[in-house]
């Protein structure tokens, strides 16, 4: 289990902040992170700070542009930080919404996945809720098209259980359909406020059956569970959100929930 650093993105923009943030997480008991939203810190310096704090990187989120146009440098950076799994955090708007756009998304990510695999790396895609919405021109969804048309050898998933749930699907069922294609799962929770608006909350305080998701992740032998909390932190403090959620994750792991 670990923390998706996008949760703490405002606290990893400089090398000193990255160091201080990792030290704080290590003190909590965190030994693994996902890197996302980090500032312009050279990979060598990132690695030194990671090693200093005894923390490993299980996966990253990087841009589609770098995957397509700067791949060699991107892979070199990942070699330096000791990570061979790279995620795309979201499909651009022009690559979703209808079958033609999704087809182009699949074509481009297939090429990326093949290029990465040829060099010993793996491509993964992180979902939101729009992948579970009906397309404009077909009685299907983007996620169904991905399931039907992507090649498991070159296209993996980073399933986000809150976004799956908010999109109207059962996270456990989706995890089972992704079997063998997941290395990292995102644990996230949310509520609907009095106006019906989505608001993220610390783990265990919302609508997602995280115990069922945890049991499914164990059954499917998914190696990593990362806590992610995009916005809406308690007291506007992402560290407080991490502390509350980390305690929940440890209780899950220890069978106390």
Language-model region placement:
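Active-site acidic/histidine proton-transfer and metal-coordination neighborhood
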Residues: 23, 39, 56, 64-157, ...
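Glycine-rich, proline-tolerant flexible connector loops at the mouths of alpha/beta enzymes
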Residues: 34-50
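Histidine-acidic metal/acid-base catalytic patches
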Residues: 1-28, 79-82, 140-159, 163-257
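Active-site-proximal beta-strand/loop segments in catalytic clefts of secreted hydrolases
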Residues: 6, 36, 62, 89-91, ...
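Generic structural signal for helix capping and beta-alpha/helix-loop junctions
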Residues: 10, 42, 67, 95, ...
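A short acidic, amphipathic alpha-helical/loop segment
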Residues: 45-49, 73-74, 170-177
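Short, well-ordered alpha-helical microsegments
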Residues: 42-44, 68-71, 210-211
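Active-site mouth loops of central-metabolism enzymes
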Residues: 4-16, 60-67, 97-100
């Amino acid at each position: 289990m670990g923390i998706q650093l996008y949760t703490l993105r405002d606290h990893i923009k400089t090398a000193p902040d990255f160091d201080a943030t990792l030290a704080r997480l290590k003190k909590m008991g965190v030994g693994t992170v996902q890197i996302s939203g980090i500032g312009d810190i050279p990979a060598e310096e990132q690695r030194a700070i990671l090693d200093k704090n005894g923390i490993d990187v299980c996966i990253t989120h990087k841009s589609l542009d770098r995957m397509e146009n700067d791949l060699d440098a991107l892979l070199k950076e990942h070699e330096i930080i000791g990570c061979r799994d790279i995620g795309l955090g979201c499909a651009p708007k022009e690559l979703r919404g209808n079958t033609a756009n999704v087809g182009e998304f699949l074509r481009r990510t297939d090429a990326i996945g093949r290029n990465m695999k040829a060099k010993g790396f793996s491509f993964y895609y992180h979902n939101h809720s729009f992948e579970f919405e009906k397309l404009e021109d077909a009685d299907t969804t983007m996620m169904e098209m991905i399931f039907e048309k992507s090649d498991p050898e070159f296209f993996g998933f980073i399933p986000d259980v809150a976004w799956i749930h908010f999109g109207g699907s059962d996270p456990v069922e989706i995890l089972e359909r992704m079997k063998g294609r997941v290395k990292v799962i995102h644990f996230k929770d949310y509520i609907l406020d009095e106006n019906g608006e989505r608001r993220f909350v610390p783990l265990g305080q919302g609508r997602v059956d995280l115990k069922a998701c945890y049991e499914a992740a164990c059954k499917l032998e998914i190696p990593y569970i990362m806590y992610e909390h995009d916005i809406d932190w308690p007291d506007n403090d992402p560290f407080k959100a991490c502390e509350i959620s980390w305690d929940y994750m440890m209780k899950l792991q220890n069978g106390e929930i």
